[in-house]
Amino acid sequence: MPLSGTPAPNKKRKSSKLIMELTGGGQESSGLNLGKKISVPRDVMLEELSLLTNRGSKMFKLRQMRVEKFIYENHPDVFSDSSMDHFQKFLPTVGGQLGTAGQGFSYSKSNGRGGSQAGGSGSAGQYGSDQQHHLGSGSGAGGTGGPAGQAGRGGAAGTAGVGETGSGDQAGGEGKHITVFKTYISPWERAMGVDPQQKMELGIDLLAYGAKAELPKYKSFNRTAMPYGGYEKASKRMTFQMPKFDLGPLLSEPLVLYNQNLSNRPSFNRTPIPWLSSGEPVDYNVDIGIPLDGETEEL
């Protein structure tokens, strides 16, 4: 008697699951730490450049040394501790606060509720547009933002000014608040003595900086056809006159005819005639009675 319906197919179990069950390492292998997966090629590139084992890394190191030498020779004030542009105070540290007089870097973590960050003392008008806030992945989304320094309901914190405190309110989780100040000054501005606090207030035009000296009036040698001395001197007539000298009587030169006897000229016809050494006539008898063979009946 046939069975009603089609039977279920016999599914084969995977060999990997069978091996894990037989060895008993299914639960232990799930907690195995295989290390950090390299996802950023920049770290690998910098590590290869620091090995100094190939030609490219050596060239990169020499280029770094040339750049440092150029900066040290042209801008020695950067390496002094008393300078405002000392770049070491702008380098961030892990979990700390760095910066003086309205400049620097602030970093903080907040667990759950009540995280805060602190920047340098300053006014919000100077660095308000350059301030950037980066929120971590644990911050909530969809809330309405409040004023500066206060947290939105169910969302991220509002934007705080420089020197103020911003608090985050997350629904259970960690969030990082990083405030980065743009304190980069170009070498042109540094050479002109521009203060970082005046960077946002001043608009410097490098072309209009300094007094312009009067250009010397050089003579133009363009392709325009201009005579030397200008058109005024060129319009005058030529004052040079040819000197007068007496011309002698014109004498006709006698015509020299070589081989005046034209009859003695050799003939270059196709008939092989020898050279004529004298004017005596030479007769040639040519038999032109060539018999003509007529056509026969066979042809």
Swiss-Prot record:
List of residues that carry Phosphoserine: S82
GO cellular component, one term: Z disc
Tissue expression summary: Expressed primarily in skeletal muscle. Detected at lower levels in heart, prostate and pancreas.
Biased composition (Gly residues): 112-125, 137-173
UniProt keyword Nucleus, yes or no: yes
InterPro entries noted in UniProt: MYOZ
Region (Disordered) residue spans: 1-34, 102-174
Major site of localization recorded for this protein: nucleus
Coiled coil (residue ranges): none
Chain segments annotated as transmembrane: none
Protein name: Myozenin-1
Gene: MYOZ1
